[in-house]
Design a protein with these regions (language model features):
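Conserved catalytic cores of very large enzyme subunits
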Residues: 1-110, 131-132, 136-203
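Contiguous, well-ordered alpha-helical segments that form the cores/surfaces of helical PPI scaffolds
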Residues: 114-127, 148
Length: 203
């Protein structure tokens, strides 16, 4: 899908004059399963919470997702205008009216967003420190720190590649159900973490 309903398009890195939401879609996004990282580095399975290990692995995962998004972006860019007559013929995308049918799509797709999604912040916090952001001030603070860490990394990618990398809370009940079933199989039932139908996807 080209549009993610929750994509908050935050300023167009590529071209300041074109910082408008219409005309840019969400090119693709991949979600990070935060509860799994929380379980691996948190108090639920260890003597103490290892935030250093948590952030290291989160950073590595984000780099993997970034590479995957870039790879997909390159594939999309190598398509030509005639592959998408409706989307582009209607002038839906910024600059699409300037392309000829045989032009590659990079010129216009660079205005789109590459989104790194995250799921299950509440369960992640519960696994890390035993409480989620609705239950304690400390958890609330940590939750914001985790989001800020991810947001800053997205901003770094955006600067480095001159593309619109954004962070979004994944609206994916189906996906979060799949994640939780895998984690339940691997780590068993953990109260407040894997003992539910699906991971929450809100802040």
């Amino acid at each position: 899908g080209y549009m993610g309903c929750r994509t908050r398009v935050i300023g167009n890195v590529v071209d300041e004059d074109k910082a408008v939401t219409p005309g840019r879609g969400n090119l693709s996004f991949t979600s990070i399963n935060l509860p799994r990282l929380g379980i691996k580095h948190g108090i639920v399975r260890n003597d103490e919470t290892d935030m250093k290990g948590f952030y290291e692995e989160l950073g590595e995962l984000m780099d993997l997702v970034k590479d995957q998004l870039l790879e997909r972006f390159e594939i999309q860019c190598n398509k030509r205008l005639y592959n998408f007559p409706f989307l582009l013929g209607q002038g839906v995308w910024i600059d699409s009216d300037k392309l000829k049918p045989n032009d590659r799509l990079r010129k216009i797709l660079k205005h789109g967003t590459l989104s790194i999604g995250f799921i299950g912040l509440a369960e992640c916090l519960k696994a890390l420190i035993g409480k989620h952001h609705g239950e304690s001030e400390e958890a609330q603070k940590l939750g914001l720190e985790i989001i800020e860490f991810m947001r800053n990394r997205c901003d770094e990618y955006a600067k480095e590649y001159k593309l619109n990398f954004t962070l979004l809370a994944t609206p994916a009940e189906g996906l979060s159900g799949r994640f939780i079933n895998i984690d339940k199989a691997v780590y068993g039932k953990i109260k407040g973490v894997t003992d539910r139908e699906y991971y929450t996807n809100s802040f």
